[in-house]
UniProtKB/Swiss-Prot annotation:
Glycans are attached at residues 98, 231, 324, 415. GO terms for cellular component: collagen trimer; extracellular region. Residues 67-156, 158-250, 251-340, 342-432, 434-521, 523-613, 821-910 form the Fibronectin type-III domain. This is Collagen alpha-1(XII) chain. It is found in: Secreted, Extracellular space, Extracellular matrix. Its main location: secreted. InterPro entries: ECM_Regulatory_Proteins, FN3_dom, FN3_sf, Ig-like_fold, VWF_A, vWFA_dom_sf. It comes from Notophthalmus viridescens. Belongs to the fibril-associated collagens with interrupted helices (FACIT) family. Disulfide bonds: none annotated.
Length: 929
């Protein structure tokens, strides 16, 4: 072989040099920048070449020395083996045995002097492969090595300390101390010492115990445990164990064949195991009773107990006896028989439709209980009750109504039942069965219906007569029929009706009822109660058919007829508010139609008052101030009928306050009178009564509630004759206005009085609430209806019309000759902060104009005044890009016109335009725009 050193100069590629040179490249490849640099590597290159020459000379010399031969291994154990070889040349001084784990690890050396050619390597790891090299030593050096490998055996041994624990009759637990080494499994063998089948189980090598099952009881076993290794079995560990004897208890102890005097038979199921004898104990349960013990053979399971006391209870036990001792006893009870008797004096009481109560005098002797049997005499239904021996009464339940039963009471003894005590009883009719139901009433007939009676009914006898007295009528009805029509009755009369089932043996339970024939007068319909408060609620109904003359309403707390309230309303009224009621109380309401010859049956309703009144929000002020020099006489005609009620009348007062508060009250301005009407109208105050607004507002706040029927026509006539006249404050040149507030249909004519208002030049406003008749309101109000007629569905909705009504009444006060507003509003010249407002003045001259403006989105109104000859102005100081309301008023003295209204929006702030940069330097420039 040729060993190559590679030297690269200047641009030589090192990877090519490494491919050419002999490994290792660290000592065989060199590079220099140019030829002048050879001096730098010459010493290192020369030294490497000389070192390799010395190594080759030494290798040649070693190869000339004779190595040992025929390496072999013997006596292999888990921690040692013997190494042997054939000798080398005669001049060998000694042998070096080098060994190490084949997978890597520390190397060990043993020197063996020549001519010995064998040695034992010790302290080795079990089941481990070792690499062994044997070198012969000569004076000139060491020979080449003789190499080989050997593997130690795995550790094998025996487990120790065999233990047997947890013995039962068919198992015990075997435990041991583990065997050394890597045990794969343990094989546990066992067989009875006295001989028998050998069995074995296998457990994992990491287990330290196992339980042997299905063993023979009371048997000694020989047990051995052998560890198994990968290389084979280890040494066995032997020992002995034994199961326990089977010990138990007999089962199902039974007493049979008791007699009245001396004996009873005792039987049981045998106890498990080898029972030698049974110990039988007998103990009287009475105080001071002796204990008797007798033994019988172990193969016996029955015995007769003799010489016992009659009528006596005994505690019994049977205990198995084994060679190892006593087992567990089974216990029971038994009793000899005693003489039997019967209860006496059967009493039947507390009978209802489904129950019968019974009691009796106790039977003699040791009674364990009573059985009470019952059987229907009408059908095959039967049943029974059971009570303890110290109880002498019971209630039979779930019986059929109106049924005859035979009852039997049996005394129950340990030896059986005595003779029965018997009797008979009949249940009452059921609550529904006692009742005759009345339906389909007319003026002269009614239908009677009842539940069928049980059993073999021959017929039903129907008896009826007027409750107030009169001739009794009797009818017979077939047994299959349970209803009949009673005829030839008197109208509006209450009858008492009885229905008696008739049997062959006699009469059954009577059914009773009552009914009233109809009135010839029809009742109102569809009653409805609503709007409950702490002391009031509303009652509404649909009118009764026919020529009704009015309605009577009675009411009282539920269950308290003594507190009966009553009121009358007219034929056109269909609603009323009941007042002065108790808080949180349920009331019954009756509404009768009243006719010339009598009244109808009642229409009945129910309602419950509340614990407290719900808060009501007052009607807000309109905010209007009716400023005018005009004079006006206003009369308010207020409906105070029962259909309004006090809570709603408070709302009416609040509504009147909101209407009248806008006017300037005085003898030279506006005067207001109020009249209230129902059945008969009355003046609350005249036009000239209140000279100031404060006095008027106080009077409105204290306006009393009148109550009564709704007679609107006579009320309109009343204020024409009593309020619109000079003697009570009416002024000839003042404008005359009437305002009607009503919640119902008028009971009298309204056409003629309404026409008189138009004829006399009085403007008439009509405000209807809730139940008002809209056609009637249009007939009453002045034209047009859009200005003079209002109708709302509820009192709480008056707040929705107060502003419009107040404004229209104010315009009526001002009259057609009032101050006219300007016209033709034009806005122009808008900027971000201003715009111009222009208008056309009214036909008459005015002192000045008021211009009011404020943002549409909300804000405080601002105003400016200009002379009456000026018809334009610029509003300044505004917000950019904002929409404004604008109102322009004509002003003359203290009088102000209606507004001329419009809107305008300011412009947004404009952005910069035409920006130019010039005179630009290194740190400055000029900007213009």
């Amino acid at each position: 072989d040729v060993e190559i050193f590679a030297v690269g100069v200047k641009d030589a590629v090192r990877s090519e040099l490494e491919a050419i040179a002999t490994p290792p490249t660290a000592t065989h490849v060199y590079t220099v920048e140019d030829f002048d640099a050879f001096q730098r590597i010459s010493f290192e290159l020369t030294q490497s070449i000389w070192l390799r020459i010395e190594q080759e000379l030494k290798s040649i010399k070693v190869k000339s020395l004779t190595p040992p031969r025929d390496l072999s291994f013997a006596e292999v154990t888990s921690s040692s083996f013997r190494v042997s070889w054939s000798p080398a040349a005669e001049d060998a001084i000694a042998y070096l045995v080098n060994y190490t784990v084949a997978l890597g690890g520390e190397e060990f050396v043993v020197s063996v002097p020549a001519p010995t050619t064998s040695t034992v390597l010790t302290n080795l790891f079990p089941k481990t492969t070792y690499e062994v090299r044997v070198v012969a030593e000569y004076p000139e050096g060491e020979s080449p090595p003789l190499k080989g490998e050997e593997t130690t055996l795995e550790v094998r041994g025996a487990p120790r300390n065999l233990r047997v624990t947890d013995e039962t009759t068919d198992s015990f637990k075997v435990g041991w101390t583990p065997a050394p080494g890597n045990v794969l499994r343990y094989r546990i063998a066992y067989r009875p010492v006295a001989g028998g089948e050998r069995k074995e189980v296998t457990v994992q090598g990491n287990e330290r115990a196992t339980t042997l099952y299905n063993l023979f009881p009371d048997t000694k076993y020989h047990v051995s445990g052998v560890p198994e290794y990968q290389s084979g079995p280890g040494t066995a560990l032997n020992g002995n164990g034994a199961t326990e004897e089977v010990v138990g208890e007999p089962k199902n102890l039974r007493v049979s064949e008791p007699t009245t005097s001396t004996a009873m038979r005792l039987t049981w199921d045998k106890a498990p195991g080898k029972v030698q004898r049974y110990l039988r104990n007998l103990h009287s349960r009475s105080a001071g009773g002796d204990i008797k013990e007798v033994t019988v053979k172990g193969d016996t399971s029955t015995t007769v107990l003799k010489e016992l006391d009659p009528g006596t209870a005994y505690t019994l036990s049977v205990n198995p006896l084994y060679a190892s001792g006593a087992g567990t006893a089974v216990t029971g009870e038994g009793a000899t028989l005693q003489e039997r008797g019967s209860p006496r004096d059967l009493i039947i009481k507390d009978i209802t439709d489904t129950t019968i109560g019974t009691s009796w005098t106790a039977a003699p002797g040791m009674v364990r209980g009573y059985r009470i049997a019952w059987q229907s005499l009408f059908d095959d239904k039967t049943g029974e009750n059971h009570v303890p021996g110290d109880t002498t009464n019971t209630v039979l339940r779930n019986l059929d109504p109106e049924t005859k039963y035979r009852l039997s009471v049996y005394a129950n003894y340990a030896s059986g039942e005595g003779d029965p005590l018997s009797g008979e009883a009949t249940t009452e009719a059921s609550p529904d069965g006692k009742i005759v139901k009345i339906s389909e009433e007319t003026e002269t007939t009614m239908k009677a219906t009842w539940q069928p009676a049980p059993g073999n009914v021959l017929n039903y006898r129907v008896v009826y007569r007027p409750r107030a007295g009169g001739r009794q009528i009797v009818a017979k009805v077939p047994p299959a029929v349970t209803s009949t029509v009673l005829r030839r009755l008197t109208p509006l009369t209450t009858y008492d009706i009885s229905v008696i089932p008739v049997y062959k043996e006699g009469d059954g339970k009577t059914r009773q009822g009552s009914g009233t024939t109809l009135s010839p007068f029809n009742a109102p319909r569809s009653i409805k109660t609503s709007e409950p408060t702490r002391s009031t609620f509303r009652v509404t109904w649909e009118p009764a058919p026919g020529e009704v003359k009015g309605y009577k309403i009675t009411f009282h707390p539920e269950g308290d007829d003594g507190y009966l309230g009553e009121m009358m309303v007219g034929p056109y009224d269909s609603t009323v508010v009941l007042e002065e009621l108790r808080a949180r109380t349920s009331y019954k309401v009756n509404v009768f139609g009243v006719f010339d010859d009598g009244q109808s049956p009642p229409l009945i309703g129910h309602e419950t008052t509340t614990l407290r009144d719900a808060p009501r929000s007052p009607i807000p002020s309109s905010g209007l101030d009716c400023t005018t020099k005009a004079q006006a006489d206003i009369v308010l005609l207020v409906d105070g009928s029962w259909s309004i009620g006090r809570p709603n009348f408070k709302i009416v007062r609040n509504f009147i306050s909101r209407v009248v508060e806008v006017f300037d009250i005085g003898s030279d301005r506006v005067q207001i009178a109020v009249s209230q009407y129902s059945g008969d109208p009355r003046t609350e105050w005249q036009l000239n009564t209140h000279k100031t607004k404060k006095s008027l507002m106080d009077a409105v706040a204290n306006l009393p509630y009148k109550g009564g029927n709704t007679n609107t026509g006579s009320a309109l006539k009343f204020i024409l004759e009593n309020n619109f006249r000079p003697g009570v404050g009416m002024r000839e040149k003042a404008r005359k206005i009437a305002i009607l507030l009503t919640d119902g249909k008028s009971q009298d004519d309204i056409v003629a009085p309404s026409k008189r208002y138009a004829d006399e030049g009085i403007e008439l406003y009509a405000v209807g609430i809730k139940n008002a008749d809209e056609n009637e309101l249009k007939e009453i109000a002045s034209d047009p209806d859009e200005l003079y007629m209002y109708n709302v569905a509820d009192f709480s909705l008056l707040t929705n019309i107060v502003n419009d009504l107040t404004e229209n009444v104010c315009n009526s006060v001002k009259g057609p000759g009032g101050l006219n507003p300007p016209s033709n509003l034009v806005t122009s010249e808008p900027t971000p902060r201003s715009f111009r407002v222009t208008w056309v003045p009214p036909s008459q001259s005015v002192e000045r104009f008021k211009v009011e403006y404020y943002p549409v989105a909300g804000g405080r109104p601002q105003e400016v005044y200009v002379r009456g000859t000026q018809t334009t102005t610029v509003l300044v100081g505004l917000k950019p890009e904002t929409e404004y309301y604008v109102n322009v008023y004509s002003v003359e003295g203290n009088e102000i016109s209606e507004p001329l209204a419009g809107t305008e929006t300011t412009l947004p702030i404009p952005s910069v335009r035409n920006m130019n940069l010039y005179d630009i330097g290194t740190t400055t420039m000029r900007v213009k725009w």
